[in-house]
């Protein structure tokens, strides 16, 4: 029995399912999860000492590569000054100023510790600001695990085929309207029927939790136009896409100014840090200025802020996103070209984020993604993993490239994909 098997058995005896986040359990692909011992650059090593080229990237945060020496040094220096204070720090101001400078839609910003906190509070804030209850989300979009959002959500919920979570009272979700992504007609109908009751629309501006799904230009324009017309708050959930698809996030690519933005992952540089921000008049409804409550013992943790500040510095260096985008396109295009005869396969990418689909076409919504060949993905996933390439253990997860990947490493990955596709077609 190898170390991964030993540790998984040990974990299952004390941790429900053996993991602290469901998708890590390999439930949708089968087999034993790899317990990671260390990570550096574009690689991770499991407890057996096996090295993998990593395209999970801690599910997005590791944009500069794992254990980047400058980030590690920033964390070390911050830790020497104390781990947590429960009081304001200059670093909090600095990172808020940095984010606001990069994202003009962010006039005011509040730090929290997780993407779930950010989206949960942004929705509470939208409801408090508008005095309305209803919210719109889209099937397959994942916005964390707060109760009102666990309705036809993405990520692990799609992996396990659950349209919602047990333990969530129906009353908690009765104000949540779930529409099809990229379906303008449904969006227009929802506002025609309930426009004066809708507090907000929350959307992943590029979906990453039913694999990578792009919005159409018309859909994006409809989101902004209808929310403005009806006085609803448009929330861009950029926890995944922020600083990942472009320096200014998806909103900079769309040319859209959302009312509120949630962010996380990259801004913490691998540490637990997230944020929500946006229009001054909305943000000033949050306590202590307004009546919408939010608090957190570890919000703005100085160690996480130090990691985030250094990461933001690195990603603003000349050529960073041009290089990252080129690497990601090289990977997606290379794997798509490597597919074997008789295997339906497509790929897409934006910035440092990519999608691999065992389907004839790139999906436009959850229904499209649900028709993909999940069994083929399982075979591909394990074929790549057995050859030292780690993708996310779910057909519904987007993948990530970092600045630590090189063209040579991408080409090695594509060569392995050629082998795996041939084995699948045999």
Swiss-Prot record:
Pfam families: Aminotran_3. This is Glutamate-1-semialdehyde 2,1-aminomutase. One of its GO terms (biological process) is protoporphyrinogen IX biosynthetic process. CDD domains: OAT_like. NCBIfam families: hemL, PRK00062.1. Its cofactor is pyridoxal 5'-phosphate. Homodimer. The modification N6-(pyridoxal phosphate)lysine is found at residue 265. One of its GO terms (molecular function) is glutamate-1-semialdehyde 2,1-aminomutase activity. The keyword Cytoplasm applies. Signal peptide: none annotated. The lineage of its organism: Bacteria, Pseudomonadati, Pseudomonadota, Betaproteobacteria, Neisseriales. It is found in: Cytoplasm. Belongs to the class-III pyridoxal-phosphate-dependent aminotransferase family. HemL subfamily. Keywords: Cytoplasm, Isomerase, Porphyrin biosynthesis, Pyridoxal phosphate. Its EC number is 5.4.3.8. It is an enzyme of class 5 (isomerase). It catalyses: (S)-4-amino-5-oxopentanoate = 5-aminolevulinate. GO terms for cellular component: cytoplasm. It comes from Neisseria gonorrhoeae (strain ATCC 700825 / FA 1090). Pathway: Porphyrin-containing compound metabolism; protoporphyrin-IX biosynthesis; 5-aminolevulinate from L-glutamyl-tRNA(Glu): step 2/2. Transmembrane segments: none annotated.
């Amino acid at each position: 029995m190898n170390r991964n098997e030993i540790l998984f058995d040990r974990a299952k005896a004390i941790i429900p399912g053996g993991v602290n986040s469901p998708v890590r359990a390999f439930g949708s692909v089968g087999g034993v999860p790899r317990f990671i011992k260390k990570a550096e650059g574009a690689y991770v090593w499991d407890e057996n000492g096996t090295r993998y080229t990593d395209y999970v990237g801690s599910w997005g945060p590791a944009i500069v590569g794992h254990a980047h020496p400058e980030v590690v040094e920033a964390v070390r220096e911050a830790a020497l000054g104390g781990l947590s204070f429960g009081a304001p720090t200059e670093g909090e101001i600095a990172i808020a100023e940095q984010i606001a400078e990069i994202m003009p839609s962010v006039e005011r910003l509040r730090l929290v510790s997780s993407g779930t906190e950010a989206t949960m509070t942004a929705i509470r804030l939208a409801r408090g600001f508008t005095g309305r209850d209803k919210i719109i989300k889209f099937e397959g979009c994942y916005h964390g695990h707060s109760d009102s959002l666990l309705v036809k959500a993405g990520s692990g919920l799609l992996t396990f085929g659950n349209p919602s979570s047990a333990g969530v009272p129906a009353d908690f979700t009765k104000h949540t309207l779930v529409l099809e992504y990229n379906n303008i007609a449904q969006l227009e109908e929802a506002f025609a029927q309930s426009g004066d009751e809708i507090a907000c629309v929350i959307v992943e501006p590029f979906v990453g939790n039913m694999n990578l799904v792009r919005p159409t230009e018309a859909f994006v324009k409809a989101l902004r136009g209808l929310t403005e017309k009806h006085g609803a708050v448009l929330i861009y959930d950029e926890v995944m896409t922020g600083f990942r698809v472009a320096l200014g996030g998806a909103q900079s690519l769309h040319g859209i100014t959302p009312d509120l933005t949630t962010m996380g992952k990259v801004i913490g540089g691998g540490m637990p840090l997230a944020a929500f921000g946006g229009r001054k008049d909305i943000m000033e409804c949050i306590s202590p200025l307004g009546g919408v409550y939010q608090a957190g013992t570890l919000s703005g943790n100085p160690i996480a802020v130090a990691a985030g500040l250094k990461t933001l510095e690195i990603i603003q260096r000349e050529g960073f996103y041009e290089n990252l985008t080129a690497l990601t396109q090289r990977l997606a295009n290379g794997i798509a070209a490597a597919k074997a005869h008789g295997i339906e396969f497509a790929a897409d990418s934006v910035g440092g984020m990519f999608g691999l689909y065992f389907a004839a076409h790139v999906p436009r919504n959850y229904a499209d993604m649900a028709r993909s060949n999940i069994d083929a993905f399982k075979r591909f996933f394990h074929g790549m993993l057995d050859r030292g390439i780690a993708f996310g253990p779910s057909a519904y997860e987007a993948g990530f490239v970092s600045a630590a990947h090189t063209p040579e490493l991408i080409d090695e990955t594509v060569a392995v994909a050629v082998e795996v596709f041939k084995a699948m077609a045999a």
